[in-house]
Amino acid sequence: MRKIVTQVGSLPLEDVNEAVAYSLKHDIPFLPELPKRGDAMMEYIKKPGNLSCLKEFKKHKFETVKIQCVGPATLMLSGFKENEAIQRICEHITAITDGLEAGETILFLDEPALGQSGVNFRELHRAIFSAYKVTPGAHVCGNMDWDLLFDSGLEIISFDASQFDITKYSGYRSGKRISWGVKRKEDIKDFREGDLLTLPCGMGTPMYKREDCGTNLNKLLKIAEEISGK
């Protein structure tokens, strides 16, 4: 069974059932976040575990599932103290994983501006990931010194392949899996077994409409078929 296509998380939808049904169409279902219902990452972290789709999503069993949470460096850039950031994140992840039935759970920490944070994110991430039985990953849609991620304890690195070429860095891969955030097939420079495909970022911004969900999924599925032969 192919396990390539998933999503960053946020969707331009409001209906919970529609969002969960959409997620289930992906190779790797993901926990939908609906900013129009208050699921923006700086909002849900105020009330950890308060996500619109969580209850409906947990009705399903998964072979592999992807969940996500705002990362500690991002919260600290927004004014949170280190201990409070980690506590809120862990409360949120615990609320998500409690009762979630999955053979494998991929957890991405969303760190949009990690390159500008100036914090020791490796220690922060380790403190979080060590508390859960998950496959650890991070999503960074901005630019940074990617060697820092290649030299981290992450197993999956998610990035905007439509803007950045991480293959040119000396530490490229270092045994890591890559989640390629693409707009077109040509954005992929070095797809290997175990890698993932997503859009460059989430679809929770005003530029995306409801009809874009199906269009973008079909595009990702087509690219996955072309590069995998499945």
Predicted regions and their residues:
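Alpha/beta catalytic barrel-like cores
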Residues: 1-85, 134, 148-195, 205-230
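N-terminal active-site wall of soluble small-molecule enzyme domains
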Residues: 118-150
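Conserved, mostly hydrophobic/aromatic
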Residues: 67, 89, 93, 111, ...
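Short, amphipathic alpha-helical segments
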Residues: 83, 87-91, 119
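Active-site-proximal loop/short-helix segments
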Residues: 68-77, 104-123
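Secondary-structure boundary elements
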Residues: 88-107, 127-137, 226-230
